[in-house]
Amino acid sequence: MARYRGAVERLERRFGVSLALKGERRLSGKSALDKRAYGPGQHGQRRAKTSDYGLQLKEKQKAKMMYGISEKQFRSIFVEANRLDGNTGENLIRLIERRLDNVVYRMGFATTRSSARQLVTHGHVLVDGKRLDIPSYFVRSGQKIEIKEKTKSNPQVVRATELTAQTGIVPWIDVEKDKKYGIFTRYPEREEVVVPIEERLIVELYSK
């Protein structure tokens, strides 16, 4: 699956928001966005007027980059969100938040979603006691997510736990940080998910 390989802080400056792509630098307030909150390049401080389509496309790209999801997966999640009852945009965000890699990140066992995805794909994460290496797996209410015993002392996991202790844990997850496990207690409400995404624009884009 194709991933963005460029300078992620430059990307954040282009979007004008933190995408949580540089964990430790972001948590310490040393990211490029904290220092220069405008676009990269010679004319970065000028904001050109963008068309409606451009705004919609930018919002989708922002969401994909933030969560580390390919176009194929993102569209598939949108189709499922549209099938469900309720607001399609809210369903979209709630479904993405249920991805296993995102839940591991939300539990504070990794400083970025990319690092969380690596923990999952390399077999370091257990779901209800069984190893699961599929980052796109949708976690269900009541499921226990745990770092494998041999990985609990991994310096990166320990460091992530220390750093994310400053930011707190989202209300739909209960975490035992010392024991490196958590319970996904319920599905999140949209207003609880603090992300700089206007999902309405994404729905408009896919609805054309």
Swiss-Prot record:
Entry keyword Ribosomal protein: yes
Organism: Helicobacter pylori (strain HPAG1)
Function per UniProt: One of the primary rRNA binding proteins, it binds directly to 16S rRNA where it nucleates assembly of the body of the 30S subunit. With S5 and S12 plays an important role in translational accuracy.
Name of the protein in its database record: Small ribosomal subunit protein uS4
GO MF terms, alphabetically ordered: rRNA binding; structural constituent of ribosome
GO cellular component: small ribosomal subunit
Subunit details: Part of the 30S ribosomal subunit. Contacts protein S5. The interaction surface between S4 and S5 is involved in control of translational fidelity.
Residue ranges, annotated region (Disordered): 31-51
InterPro entries from the UniProt entry: Ribosomal_uS4, Ribosomal_uS4_bac-type, Ribosomal_uS4_CS, Ribosomal_uS4_N, S4_RNA-bd, S4_RNA-bd_sf
Domain of life of the native organism: Bacteria
Keywords for the protein's UniProt record, in alphabetical order: Ribonucleoprotein, Ribosomal protein, RNA-binding, rRNA-binding
Pfam families found in the cross-reference section: Ribosomal_S4 (PF00163), S4 (PF01479)
Similarity comment: family membership: Belongs to the universal ribosomal protein uS4 family.
Keyword presence, RNA-binding: yes
Location of the S4 RNA-binding domain: 98-156
GO biological processes: ribosomal small subunit biogenesis; translation
Chain's gene name: rpsD
